[in-house]
A protein has these predicted regions:
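A short beta-loop-beta micro-motif enriched in histidine and acidic residues
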Residues: 50-52, 62-77
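Histidine-centered metal-chelating micro-motifs
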Residues: 64-66, 84, 101, 105-112
Length: 138
């Protein structure tokens, strides 16, 4: 196999592993019940070692996604429903459709759907390339 094909195969395998870690944090088997993460796009940036990742996140009513961090900044745009975000060291913030939130790199945070319908957000991450997009925090 040519060197280019080997590199391409390795890159594709790494992308698949990263996708699994994003889709099922803490488990390579399935997404947590009531949570759906859909990878939309991933692109290298002009800043070496950084990439932009966009993910749609859907939480069923009453479902929470526990404390976690990201290896870069997260910008949230709420598409529908109502989220409550708990960001370490700050009071909870409630977000509805059209609201935005910025979360600094490495900041521990959690989200919960506090509404009666599925809550959906567009999450844009500016992160260190090659690191897991999400790390659970106990």
């Amino acid at each position: 196999m040519s060197n280019i094909l080997v590199k391409t195969a390795r890159a594709m395998a790494m992308a698949a592993l990263i996708s699994v870690s994003v889709l099922a944090p803490g488990s390579a088997q399935a997404q947590p019940s009531g949570i759906k993460r859909t990878d939309l796009q991933r692109h290298d940036l002009s800043v070496p070692g950084r990439e932009a990742v966009q993910v749609r996140v859907d939480l069923e009513p009453g479902v929470a996604f526990g404390n976690h961090t990201h290896p870069g900044e997260e910008i949230i745009y709420v598409l529908e429903g109502t989220f409550e975000y708990q960001i370490e060291g700050k009071p909870p913030v409630t977000l509805k459709a059209g609201d935005v939130l910025f979360i600094p790199a490495g900041t521990v945070h959690a989200a919960k759907n506090v509404g009666s319908v599925t809550a959906s957000e567009l999450a844009t991450y500016i992160v260190e390339k090659g690191k897991p997009l999400l790390t659970l925090v106990k």
